[in-house]
């Protein structure tokens, strides 16, 4: 019996040694040899560049399907600029105020989650204050659109470990966005002659001074949106004071087209608006220009029409928009209406000098 027990102990000892030797290299054995590690991702700032460019690609979504939901099917009709021109959209759409249930959360899901999650990850992989300042501007550029659409959203407690993350009121979101912009403006002004990697920037090619002007311009935009409210920041500044600060800032605001914030960098399909107007539906496009905007511009004989629209192919030509919310007719007729003047290589506009000029005039 003693002999058997001794042998049994020996067996267990060998098994224990074998188990230890197996688990000692467990992570290495189970690591995909064709996949980069976290350490490799951080070399040469690759991870920062990846998170930054991803954030930039979601301010106005560059994915054609997501952009169609957020800016063409939703923003286009409600703004009076774009209408649906595919009779597959004859039921359950934003332009008739009865969107399908799975359409309503898309704007929140694709823009908000991509901006906030990638910002959090970027802050984990870099301590570069310039990169973080630019990322704050990008975050506000994307997320303020989400708050404008839905109102309260999680913002101030994202990344704190709270589960679930509580909603902030729209007032609290605006306070936090102004704080983010102020922090970014301070860094970008102080380091205005500096750069971030051009590979991390598809808007201004790494130019910090231009990012500072965009930050001030966004601050002006947000201030003017709440100028007739009782809003104040944590330190008591009113929207009027915030707007005046932005314009009087050392870097100033976007003042000419050279400073326009325009995203440049698409996949093989090109500009997503081009895809929506010229590629979907066998090349005829799912959308046309809305009658709202063409009626105004035709009424004033606005000289910008040729830059904004393509002429209709009706016998009389001209710029003819399609009414929003109607029952969409057959393709033969619908395809004659004016389309957006956009090409596959046209840059995506975030903010431009003309908007800033109007904001300044309103103030």
Sequence positions of predicted segments:
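Intrinsic-disorder/low-complexity regions
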Residues: 3-6, 24-27, 179
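Hydrophobic alpha-helical elements and their junctions with loops/disorder across both membrane
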Residues: 17-20, 62, 191
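Membrane-proximal, proline-rich intrinsically disordered regions
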Residues: 22-80, 110-113, 125
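Structured, solvent-exposed acidic/aromatic patches
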Residues: 42-46, 82-363
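Terminal low-complexity, poorly structured segments
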Residues: 4, 13, 69-70, 238
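Sec-dependent bacterial lipoprotein signal peptides
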Residues: 1-20
């Amino acid at each position: 019996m003693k002999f058997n027990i001794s042998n049994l102990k020996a067996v267990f000892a060998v098994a224990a040694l074998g188990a230890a030797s197996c688990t000692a290299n467990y992570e290495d054995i189970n690591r995909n040899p064709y996949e980069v590690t976290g350490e490799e991702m951080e070399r040469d700032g690759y991870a920062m560049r990846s998170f930054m460019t991803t954030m930039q690609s979601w301010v106005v979504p560059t994915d054609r399907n997501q952009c169609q939901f957020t800016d063409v099917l939703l923003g286009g009709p409600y703004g009076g600029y774009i209408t649906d021109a595919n009779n597959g959209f004859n039921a359950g759409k934003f332009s008739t105020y009865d969107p399908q249930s799975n359409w309503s959360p898309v704007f929140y899901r694709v823009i908000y989650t991509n901006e906030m999650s990638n910002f959090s990850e970027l802050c984990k992989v870099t301590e570069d204050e310039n990169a973080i300042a630019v990322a704050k501007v990008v975050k506000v550029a994307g997320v303020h659109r989400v708050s404008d659409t839905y109102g309260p959203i999680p913002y101030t407690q994202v990344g704190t470990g709270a589960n679930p993350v509580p909603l902030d009121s729209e007032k609290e979101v605006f306070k936090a966005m102004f704080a983010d912009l102020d922090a970014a403006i301070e860094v970008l002004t102080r380091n205005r002659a500096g750069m971030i990697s051009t590979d991390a920037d598809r808007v201004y090619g790494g130019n910090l001074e231009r990012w500072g002007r965009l930050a001030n311009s966004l601050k002006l935009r947000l201030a003017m949106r709440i100028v007739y409210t009782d809003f104040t920041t944590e330190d008591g500044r009113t929207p009027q004071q915030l707007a005046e600060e932005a314009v009087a800032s050392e870097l100033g605001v976007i003042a000419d087209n050279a400073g326009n914030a325009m995203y440049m960098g698409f996949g093989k399909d090109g500009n997503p608006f081009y895809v929506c107007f010229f590629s979907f539906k066998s090349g005829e496009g799912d959308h046309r220009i809305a009658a709202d905007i063409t009626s105004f511009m035709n009424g004033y004989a606005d000289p910008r029409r040729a830059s904004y629209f393509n002429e209709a192919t009706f016998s009389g030509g001209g710029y003819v928009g399609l009414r929003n919310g109607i029952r969409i007719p057959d393709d033969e007729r619908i395809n004659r209406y004016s389309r957006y003047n956009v090409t596959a290589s046209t840059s995506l506009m975030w903010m431009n000098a003309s908007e800033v000029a109007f904001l300044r005039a309103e103030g």
